[in-house]
């Protein structure tokens, strides 16, 4: 029986379905057209899935946010030159990088009133670096984009990798999120066989 044209298409099952989260996310994506869409067809939907997966796994309650609190995230898909400028101006490093995160939430500051959206911050990806890294790693650009967005959003939620224990926690969470989508562990080679079975 043909589908009713008045009804929306069902969400496909499996790893492409949106991940449910207790925190509604208002996501603003800039730059998804043009070169980014050519690189990863459907990139806007892909990055939305990555954001929702990171929020669902990252537990915003650590900031004192209660389930149902709307979260706002801005995501910029741009090029190496723009990311290099951001990296130089805000981090003092005059070079491009794959992803930058600018967290807006501070655990020491008061939260907005109940029901008011909470700005988590901004994430920016550099296209040429993403392409180069994906080629070097032998993985699909779409999988690398998904991983970098997850990584960036986890930074907005307070995760970090400056200390070894923090890095293991963050990498373990990323690996679990990616695994649920069928993406291989990006840290397996760096971890080495002696740590392959460790609790991350």
Swiss-Prot record:
Composition-biased stretches (Pro residues): 1-18
Region ranges (Disordered): 1-22
Record text on cofactor binding: Binds 1 zinc ion.
GO biological process, one term: rRNA processing
PROSITE patterns assigned: UPF0054
Keywords: Cytoplasm, Endonuclease, Hydrolase, Metal-binding, Nuclease, Ribosome biogenesis, rRNA processing, Zinc
Cellular compartment(s): Cytoplasm
Cofactor or coenzyme needed: Zn(2+)
Pfam families documented for this protein: YbeY
CC annotations in GO: cytoplasm
One GO MF term attached to the UniProt entry: metalloendopeptidase activity
N-terminal signal peptide: none
Highest taxon of the lineage: Bacteria
Sequence similarity: Belongs to the endoribonuclease YbeY family.
Function: Single strand-specific metallo-endoribonuclease involved in late-stage 70S ribosome quality control and in maturation of the 3' terminus of the 16S rRNA.
Protein name: Endoribonuclease YbeY
